Amino acid sequence: MRINPTISGPGVSTLEEKNLGRVAQIIGPVLDVAFPPGKMPNIYNALVVKGRDTVGQQINVTCEVQQLLGNNRVRAVAMSATDGLTRGLEVIDTGAPLSVPVGGATLGRIFNVLGEPVDNLGPVDTRTTSPIHRSAPAFIQLDTKLSIFETGIKVVDLLAPYRRGGKIGLFGGAGVGKTVLIMELINNIAKAHGGVSVFGGVGERTREGNDLYMEMKESGVINEQNIAESKVALVYGQMNEPPGARMRVGLTALTMAEYFRDVNEQDVLLFIDNIFRFVQAGSEVSALLGRMPSAVGYQPTLSTEMGSLQERITSTKEGSITSIQAVYVPADDLTDPAPATTFAHLDATTVLSRGLAAKGIYPAVDPLDSTSTMLQPRIVGEEHYETAQRVKQTLQRYKELQDIIAILGLDELSEEDRLTVARARKIERFLSQPFFVAEVFTGSPGKYVGLAETIRGFQLILSGELDGLPEQAFYLVGNIDEATAKAMNLEVESKLKK
């Protein structure tokens, strides 16, 4: 669907042109506003409350209309704190939904839900803006070709490949490398696809958002010298913000991504961390609006809200939005309505394992738990599919044998099983890879590995051609040629020591 971005000056135009109302009631972040008869705003219109609070401070609170109550009243949800608001304050109907800046001006900057920069780097060019509420692209505009989105990360491309224009769920606890994986993907898409990324921090910790920003500056994803050369736009609505802001910040990020897809005709990567917080904020707003709760206390409109966000994340004939969404699973219950509703929209899952992280294997992607609908012979080809299946079978057999090894030791295994274990350990290490964004910490240069190289490497390990090489030769290398070169270096080093 083509965006028609508006070319306009920033802010609200003169009061005389707009409908004016008055605040009639305030309950937390929810405001009831009375308008003159025949001057009612539409659902999703942005309202601006202007005036002074009880101590004379200037107030400027933006709200979004959610319900028409009758008796010339509307109920709106505030996008920022409502402290200091009083009944009788003047409310301006802007006559349109919330609009945010889009285009190249957003790159390298941090925004809040309203599209206002919050990084103290000065104003942003707001001549090109776009409303955050839009319908999903029409069916006829969708690109239905199934194509793989190559990330340059071996474990992802081989075992759980991403779909171009697809949605990926990223499951992982604290400290297993979600942020580093996200940053590497942003870096790789910028280099290999010339694309841009948009990061939507939905209800996340402020500290994490700050850490991500600092790490992006360190790794060069955000270019401090020439901000326009940056490859990412950041939109944050943290945990401490009102539910209205957390509910809409995902749409703000998506709107920026849609512009890059539809107008600039680029492939865009959209990160949402965390999609569960989007549902949680919707649940809070639903309760504040007085709707009857549904299963487990969630909003009755859960599927509709999730669908309206997810259906806009798609490939069109112009470009694609590939979305990677961190998914928090409450109490590890996958049947909870929030993750269950999210699963229905995902094309692939990337599960990060604490066990692999503890072994020092990064990225700590669990090769057996991660899944993808793209791993089918008719999509990825027979060679890729067969290699992936054999890798999984080898790793699965190793997993089954681990109890026996722990109790009896390797010597008690049959010759065939010992060979399987040796190859599985090589595969496990070869699934690790040095990242560009981790260069500053590890000192080893990052590697982008093409899909063909990845398949060739694993085929050589499975065929037994590399059985003579030590397993540490496969740890943190790019392609298989680097592993053989590393093995030769290790051999030379060991001879020198003797």
From Swiss-Prot:
Q: What class of enzyme is it?
A: translocase
Recorded hits in Gene3D superfamilies, A to Z, give: 2.40.10.170, Bovine Mitochondrial F1-atpase, Atp Synthase Beta Chain, Chain D, domain 3, P-loop containing nucleotide triphosphate hydrolases
PROSITE patterns per the UniProt record, alphabetical: ATPASE_ALPHA_BETA
Looking at the UniProt record for this protein, which Gene Ontology cellular component terms does it annotate, in alphabetical order? Answer: chloroplast thylakoid membrane; mitochondrion; proton-transporting ATP synthase complex
Q: Which InterPro entries match?
A: AAA+_ATPase, ATP-synt_VA_C, ATP_synth_F1_bsu, ATPase_a/bsu_AS, ATPase_alpha/beta_chains, ATPase_F1/V1/A1_a/bsu_N, ATPase_F1/V1/A1_a/bsu_N_sf, ATPase_F1/V1/A1_a/bsu_nucl-bd
- Please give the SUPFAM superfamilies that the UniProt record associates with this protein: C-terminal domain of alpha and beta subunits of F1 ATP synthase, N-terminal domain of alpha and beta subunits of F1 ATP synthase, P-loop containing nucleoside triphosphate hydrolases
HAMAP family from the entry?
A: ATP_synth_beta_bact
The protein's name in its UniProt record: ATP synthase subunit beta, chloroplastic
> What membrane topology is given?
Peripheral membrane protein
Q: What species is given as this protein's source?
A: Trochodendron aralioides (Wheel tree)
What's this protein's function? Produces ATP from ADP in the presence of a proton gradient across the membrane. The catalytic sites are hosted primarily by the beta subunits.
Q: Where in the cell is it found?
A: Plastid, Chloroplast thylakoid membrane
Where this protein primarily resides, as one coarse class? plastid
Q: How does it assemble?
A: F-type ATPases have 2 components, CF(1) - the catalytic core - and CF(0) - the membrane proton channel. CF(1) has five subunits: alpha(3), beta(3), gamma(1), delta(1), epsilon(1). CF(0) has four main subunits: a(1), b(1), b'(1) and c(9-12).
The family line of this record is: Belongs to the ATPase alpha/beta chains family.
The UniProt catalytic activity note for this protein reads: ATP + H2O + 4 H(+)(in) = ADP + phosphate + 5 H(+)(out)
Q: Which UniProt keywords apply?
A: ATP synthesis, ATP-binding, CF(1), Chloroplast, Hydrogen ion transport, Ion transport, Membrane, Nucleotide-binding, Plastid, Thylakoid, Translocase, Transport
Q: Which NCBIfam families match?
A: atpD
EC numbers listed for it are 7.1.2.2
